[in-house]
UniProtKB/Swiss-Prot annotation:
Annotated PROSITE patterns: AA_TRNA_LIGASE_II
Protein name listed in UniProt: Proline--tRNA ligase
GO biological process, one term: prolyl-tRNA aminoacylation
Gene that encodes the chain: proS
GO molecular function, one term: ATP binding
Origin organism lineage: Bacteria, Pseudomonadati, Pseudomonadota, Gammaproteobacteria, Legionellales
Similarity comment text for this entry: Belongs to the class-II aminoacyl-tRNA synthetase family. ProS type 1 subfamily.
Record localization: Cytoplasm
Disulfide bonds: none
């Protein structure tokens, strides 16, 4: 491609509304342009990158024998009403009516559509397992779209769906897709982790997220330094501590804590550390009006874990202070598990404390030297907390460390959630109708582009991994308009590299060298070749890698092979 014939529009200034590096650089390099809130046009430069992502994904999906199809973006409401998600999906579901007042949504995902297709197309166990995928535009009506295409309302996604009769078959396909995702991100040159994850609104029995590691990532990931264990903050757990094996010899004592309502205030007043206290949170129960969740004072409640407890109402709902005072006759800051007449669920870390400070269920009063069993009873012990850096890994191997990531892929073992709701069944080997079970495998195509930039950039611009770069090589002829030798050599190099299947940009614009070099760094082309009269006099071409500040001179007759070897490494 010749830059003079290409729509190459870059910006020096960073847009004011661009918060993170990928958003800033995608706008400055001319990859995207904003149309509206959370809506972006992919310009020619950005589309080249997007297509490279799609091609890698498509190649690896095809290797798993998944079959590509394309489903409608607009979906009838009846399908979503069958599964109950029309009511439960929430405000992110963009709904509409046609001229006949029939209701539809613009699909944020396609579980209902694919299940509807397969319940009509599949009749026998002999047709299973099957796996279908598409690369399709989705829409989620984000309340606050931000970070450019990282959290846009309209986005492109690869979603795949597999159908099975046995859990063993599902697990086999799940493993194949998991490995395909690893190959995809390896080929893209991205540093990532596959982590255990909560199934969330999609549902299912097991899932893994694929997280591209980046300091700007919104997700917290915990991983062991001595094993393969890794999970996101919602799912991560630590080695369960033993229950307190020593009894408290001190007598439980009631003390005044005037106007001390928070853990920090109580701990400071009593001259103790916050990890010597416990806190009691009151939430709505599934069968009881109120349930108490008890954690060590320095721990944070993991709301996803708490919601999974059978006694806790979903979604998690905290009881307001006025109702607590009316029902329990105790202000919120003084509640504790001693003689508390509602179900009590205690976190394992809190249960491991031989004694603790807790609210006394009287205003401005706390107990010191309280102990489990002797003074405080509980209904269940459960993992309720967010893990912390330095916690022991749950597999007993190593300690947990924390990093940030950007979720770019998510795979699920759905089970029969959708198939059962939509009566998707086939005749099994015994001649009986059996409900199918499903797998679901999502990968954010547009998000991968932004995540790659978050991981690969510097103060000058993007540093594309070779597999994703819009162009692999940039040839810059200096003063090519005035020097026939420079122009001729640049053209010769351009044609030779193209003949070897290399994506080449010939930047033949009539601009100053500084502008051409700055644009190359901003766009992030991995390999730069500069053709100048001075270098030609020495029989050389100047080479510079985007990852290095150093330049080197390469003999003219060796340049093509030099580039080919670099690209094929």
């Amino acid at each position: 491609m010749r830059a003079s014939q290409w729509f190459l529009v870059t910006q020096k200034e960073t847009p004011n509304d661009a918060e993170i590096a990928s958003h800033q650089l995608m706008l400055r390099s001319g990859m995207i342009r904003k149309l509206g809130s959370g809506l972006y046009t992919w310009m020619p430069l950005g589309l080249r990158v997007l297509r490279k992502v799609e091609n890698i994904v498509r190649e690896e999906m095809n290797k798993t024998h998944a079959m590509e199809l394309l489903m409608p973006s607009v979906q009838p409401a009846e399908l979503w009403q069958e599964t109950g998600r029309w009511e439960t999906f929430g405000g992110q579901l963009l709904t509409m009516k046609d001229s006949n007042q029939r209701e539809y949504c613009f699909g944020p995902t396609h579980e209902e559509v694919i299940t509807d297709i397969m319940r009509n197309e599949l009749q026998s166990y002999k047709q299973l397992p099957v796996n279908f995928y598409q690369i399709q535009t989705k829409f989620r009506d984000e309340i606050r779209p931000r970070f450019g295409v990282m959290r846009a309302r309209e986005f492109i996604m690869k979603d795949a769906y597999s159908f099975h009769l046995s859990l063993e078959s599902l697990q086999e396909t799940y493993k194949d897709m998991y490995q395909a995702y690893c190959r995809i991100f390896d080929r893209m040159g991205l540093k990532y982790r596959a982590v255990e994850a909560d199934t969330g609104a999609i549902g299912g029995s097991a899932s893994h997220e694929f997280q591209v590691l980046a300091e700007s990532g919104e997700d917290l990931i915990f991983y062991s330094d001595a094993s393969d264990y890794a999970a996101n903050i919602e799912q991560a757990t630590s080695l369960k501590p033993p229950k307190a094996n020593q009894s408290c010899n001190e007598t439980i004592t009631l003390v005044d804590t005037p106007n001390k309502k928070t853990i920090d205030e109580v701990a400071s007043f009593l001259g103790i550390a916050s990890n010597q206290t416990i806190k009691t949170l009151i939430v709505k129960g599934k069968e009881h009006p109120m349930v108490a969740l008890v954690l060590r004072g320095d721990d944070e409640l993991n709301e996803v874990k708490a919601t999974k407890h059978p006694l806790v109402h979903s979604p998690l709902s905290f009881i307001d202070e006025e109702l607590i005072l009316k029902t329990l006759k105790t202000p919120l800051g003084s509640i504790g598990p001693v003689k508390l007449n509602i179900p009590v669920i205690v976190d394992h870390q809190a249960l491991a404390m031989p004694s603790f400070v807790c609210g006394a269920n009287q205003a401005d009063k706390h107990f010191i030297n309280a102990a489990w069993e002797r003074d405080a009873k509980y209904d269940d012990a459960y993992d309720l907390r967010n893990v912390k850096e330095g916690d022991p890994s749950p597999d007993g191997r190593g300690t947990l460390h924390c990093c940030r990531g950007i979720e770019v892929g998510h795979v699920f073992q759905l089970g029969d959630k959708y198939a059962k709701a939509m009566n998707a069944s086939v005749i099994n080997e015994q001649g009986q109708l059996q409900t199918m079970i499903m797998g679901c495998y999502g990968l954010g195509i547009t998000r991968v582009v932004a995540a790659a930039i978050e991981q690969h950039h510097d103060e000058h611009g993007i540093i594309w991994p070779q597999a994703l770069a819009p162009f692999q090589v940039n040839i810059i002829p200096l003063n090519g308009a005035r020097s026939h030798a420079v122009k001729e050599q640049a053209e010769s190099l351009y044609q030779q590299l193209k003949s070897h299947g290399i994506d080449v940009l010939l930047d033949d614009r009539n601009e100053r060298a500084g502008v051409l070099f700055a644009d190359n760094d901003l766009i992030g082309i991995p390999h730069r070749l500069v053709v100048s009269e001075r270098n030609l006099e020495q029989g050389c071409i100047e080479y510079k890698s985007r990852t290095s500040s150093e330049t080197q001179l390469i003999n003219l007759d060796k340049v093509v092979n030099f580039i080919i070897e670099l690209i094929n490494k």
